[in-house]
């Protein structure tokens, strides 16, 4: 929406960004950094020592990276779990970020226009307020997941939380006003109690003194959720400016990418390979991996499988897998520790993506017209999986325990059956809509222009 009656102020060219230290949050924040830099802003990124992102040569002129001290050992993430780690991180960083921001205000040659913080780094709001700087929330999840978090408190207050943790039948019930989401799809976590999750969500969706919210999504994907947030929940401007990976590329992988898989893909037929990657956090037990391997072998489809180091509990990588694992995967498969995902999804050989359905992976897959097998792990992934299957109709959700038969049937449905071909057609249509949205005159392009104008008038 255009802000009328305001004139842009000169010399407000610096923006401070505060990413959450996880791969799925760092990537879109750095894409936002590149996007705003292209619009004429100098960028200061304030990071924690935990999961520190080491900037490449892509981030040089007009980019500054500052690290704030915190005393969180690497082991805390595993020992505490993501939710308790989040609480501790926000508590640890509150004072150090305020001191850092105060120094930046004194040192910056360009006046700071605003502080943009990841919704999970909510400690940044108080410091921005104290330094008399406008602050803006950046949601790296879907608008629908953000909307779900925004009503969580109301559900909890009305004692509607029972279906979120009670019997299977109740969990299957549809959530009023959030069709087609079921209670079981709401973004809860297997890592913490419902009460702890409630506290996180109260903090992440509390706009406090925020001037606006920006979301890495597009109107063509989530128009109803965006309208709900804008008109009923937030009452401040909401800017859908994504998918950001289609606006500005930014190399941000915390793990080394094995690009040999591209050479392997070059030898495969069009739409003949299913790509399997469960993201940067999800874990799989050995028995689950064996069932997946067995199902893949039975499907007779070629596959590129990312098995992340440390993703198998009790094992560094696949060295502890039974001997039959290698026999099942070597014939038609290729396994890497980490892959250049955007390059993989854009490869003509890839016809499907088995994913945990993190929002970045979801956007990247839709952006390349690749349908998905959905195996959500936690949090907003379940929301995304439900939308992929029931709203956009380009996904097959695999629920419950994994066994060879379930895996084989899902892969064949996507890669062999007519159903999968229809999904590819719908995915291609969504891909074209997303590409149009980020081009001049498109909805995300216009929203980005309005957002840039907005922060120049603050």
UniProtKB/Swiss-Prot annotation:
Presence of the UniProt keyword Glycosyltransferase in the record: yes
One example GO MF annotation: quercetin 7-O-glucosyltransferase activity
Protein's job: Possesses quercetin 3-O-glucosyltransferase and 7-O-glucosyltransferase activities in vitro.
Active site as annotated: 25, 118
Keywords: Glycosyltransferase, Transferase
InterPro entries in the record: UDP_glucos_trans (IPR002213)
Entry EC no(s): 2.4.1.91, 2.4.1.237
Reaction(s) this enzyme catalyzes, per UniProt: a flavonol + UDP-alpha-D-glucose = a flavonol 3-O-beta-D-glucoside + UDP + H(+); a 7-O-hydroxy-flavonol + UDP-alpha-D-glucose = a flavonol 7-O-beta-D-glucoside + UDP + H(+)
Entry binding sites for UDP-alpha-D-glucose: 140, 339, 341, 356, 359-361, 364, 380-381
Identification of the protein by name: Flavonol 3-O-glucosyltransferase UGT76E12
Gene this chain is encoded by: UGT76E12
Domain of life: Eukaryota
Residue numbers binding an anthocyanidin: 25, 379
Family: Belongs to the UDP-glycosyltransferase family.
């Amino acid at each position: 929406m255009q802000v009328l009656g305001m004139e842009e102020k000169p010399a407000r060219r610096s923006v401070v960004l505060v990413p959450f230290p996880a791969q799925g949050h760092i990537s879109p924040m750095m894409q936002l950094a590149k996007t705003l830099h292209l619009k004429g802003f100098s960028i200061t990124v304030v990071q924690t020592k935990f999961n520190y992102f080491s900037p490449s040569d892509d981030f040089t002129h007009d980019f500054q990276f500052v690290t704030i001290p915190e005393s969180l050992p690497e082991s805390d993430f595993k020992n505490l779990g993501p939710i308790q780690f989040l609480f501790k991180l926000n508590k640890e960083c509150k004072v150090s970020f305020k001191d850092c921001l105060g120094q930046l205000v004194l040192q910056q040659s360009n006046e700071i226009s605003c502080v943009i913080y990841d919704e999970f780094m909510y400690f940044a709001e108080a410091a921005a307020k104290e330094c008399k700087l406008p602050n803006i929330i950046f949601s790296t999840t879907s608008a629908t997941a953000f909307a779900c978090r925004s009503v969580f408190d109301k559900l909890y207050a009305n004692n509607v939380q029972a279906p979120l943790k009670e019997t299977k039948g109740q969990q299957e019930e549809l959530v009023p006003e959030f069709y087609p989401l079921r209670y079981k799809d709401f973004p809860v976590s297997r890592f913490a109690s419902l009460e702890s999750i409630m506290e996180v969500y109260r903090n992440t969706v509390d706009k406090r003194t925020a001037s606006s919210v920006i979301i890495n999504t597009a109107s063509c994907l989530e128009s109803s959720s965006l309208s709900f947030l804008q008109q009923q929940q937030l009452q401040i401007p909401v800017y859908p400016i994504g998918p950001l990976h289609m606006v500005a590329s930014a190399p941000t992988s915390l793990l080394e990418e094995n690009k040999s898989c591209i050479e392997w893909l070059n030898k495969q037929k069009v739409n003949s390979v299913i790509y399997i990657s469960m993201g940067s956090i999800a874990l799989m037990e050995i028995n689950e991996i064996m069932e997946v391997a067995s199902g893949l072998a039975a499907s007779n489809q070629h596959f590129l499988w990312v098995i992340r180091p440390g993703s198998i509990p009790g094992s560094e990588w696949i060295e502890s897998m039974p001997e039959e694992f290698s026999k099942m995967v070597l014939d038609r498969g290729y396994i890497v520790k980490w892959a250049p995902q955007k390059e993989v999804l854009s490869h003509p050989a890839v016809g499907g993506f088995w994913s945990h359905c993190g929002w970045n992976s979801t956007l990247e897959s839709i952006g390349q017209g690749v349908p998905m097998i959905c195996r959500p792990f936690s949090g907003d992934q379940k929301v995304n999986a439900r939308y992929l299957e029931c709203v956009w109709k380009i996904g097959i959700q695999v629920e419950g325990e994994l066994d060879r038969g379930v895996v084989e049937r899902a892969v064949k449905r996507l890669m062999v059956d007519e159903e999968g071909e229809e999904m590819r057609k719908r995915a291609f249509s969504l891909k074209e809509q997303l590409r149009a949205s980020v081009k001049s005159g498109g909805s995300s392009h216009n929203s980005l222009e309005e957002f840039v104008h907005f922060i120049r008038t603050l």
